[in-house]
């Protein structure tokens, strides 16, 4: 058993339905998690700030601040994984939730087993707390990397350091969520190589992620916005229509596994 598996996951549940929070608390505690529940958005923000949880389960329809605004605000100080919960099934709610920084979206009513599976899938991903994020002064040195290594590299105006979990563009620090950082790291490690949406899901979210490929597009859109990338004329992350994404290189085309990236996905082995 790894050291990570020995740590008790901390979960904050923010929902104004007592019956649901009691059910979720009981189920997660039986799974070995420490759970705190809150009935409104302000209390949820305070709990996240005070307890620094690994996971936040956040209802969309909350009294006072709605779940979208709570998620937006907590992203100012926390990189806890966030799963949005909602009785509404509109796709726009799912898109908005992912846009404001949520990692997943689960429609009510849901199976406790499915909830636990999604929590476990996110928690298995490597994480680093905000306490380990370097100060702006520390980050400035990243752009001076003499040569690429397994843990740090420079791609034109972009520099990444995996150990520091830091990104700079033209020497300026860029704040990314863990998912956004991992997406950028995976793509920029091998410029020009096409990575399919399913490969991104498998390698960033985890092979047991329950959801559809649309989540990748939403997080890539957030990433592009933060690094100043124009989707119509990208300088960093380029869309390969119908397949996935690649990090731009001087070459106009490069193949992944020897295949033309313009081939339909059905002809690429998964």
Q: What kind of region is each of these model predictions?
A:
Residues 7-10, 121-194, 198, 258, ...:
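Short, Lys/Arg-enriched segments at the junction into DNA-binding effector domains
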Residues 51-57, 62:
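Active-site beta3 strand of CheY-like receiver
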Residues 32-39, 47:
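Short hydrophobic/Thr-rich beta-strand motif most characteristic of the beta2 strand and flanking loop
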Residues 102, 157, 164-236, 240-243:
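Positively charged, aromatic-enriched patches within helix-turn-helix-type DNA-binding elements
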Residues 40-43, 54, 66-69, 93:
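Acidic catalytic/metal-coordinating carboxylates
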Residues 22-30:
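Charged docking surfaces used in two-component/phosphorelay signaling
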Residues 8, 52-54, 77-82, 210:
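His-Asp phosphorelay/catalytic-motif detector in bacterial-type signaling
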Residues 66, 72, 76, 81-154, ...:
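Basic, amphipathic DNA-recognition helix from helix-turn-helix-like DNA-binding domains
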């Amino acid at each position: 058993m790894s050291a990570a598996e020995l740590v008790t996951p901390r979960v904050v549940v923010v929902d104004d339905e007592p019956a649901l929070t009691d059910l979720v608390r009981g189920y997660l505690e039986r799974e070995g998690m420490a759970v705190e529940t809150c009935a409104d958005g302000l209390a949820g923000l305070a709990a996240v700030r005070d307890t620094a949880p690994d996971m936040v389960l956040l209802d969309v329809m909350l009294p006072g601040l709605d779940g979208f605004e709570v998620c937006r605000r907590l992203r100012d100080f926390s990189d806890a994984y966030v799963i949005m919960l909602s009785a509404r099934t509109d796709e726009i709610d799912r898109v908005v939730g992912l846009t404001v920084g949520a990692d997943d979206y689960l429609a009510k009513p849901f199976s406790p087993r499915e909830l636990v599976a999604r929590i476990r899938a996110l928690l298995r991903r490597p994480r680093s707390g905000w306490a380990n994020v370097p100060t702006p002064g520390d980050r400035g040195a990243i752009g001076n990397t003499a040569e690429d290594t397994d843990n740090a590299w420079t791609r034109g105006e972009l520099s990444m350091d995996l150990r520091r979990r830091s990104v700079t563009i033209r020497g300026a620090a860029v704040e990314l969520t863990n998912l956004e950082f991992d997406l950028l790291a995976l793509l920029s490690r091998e410029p020009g190589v096409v990575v399919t949406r399913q490969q991104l899901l498998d390698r960033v979210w985890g092979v047991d992620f329950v959801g559809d490929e649309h989540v990748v597009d939403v997080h890539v859109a957030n990433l592009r916005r933060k690094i100043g990338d124009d989707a119509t004329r990208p300088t960093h992350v380029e869309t390969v229509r119908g397949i996935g994404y690649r990090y731009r290189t001087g070459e106009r085309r490069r193949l992944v596994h020897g295949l033309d990236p313009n081939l339909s996905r059905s002809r690429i082995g998964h």
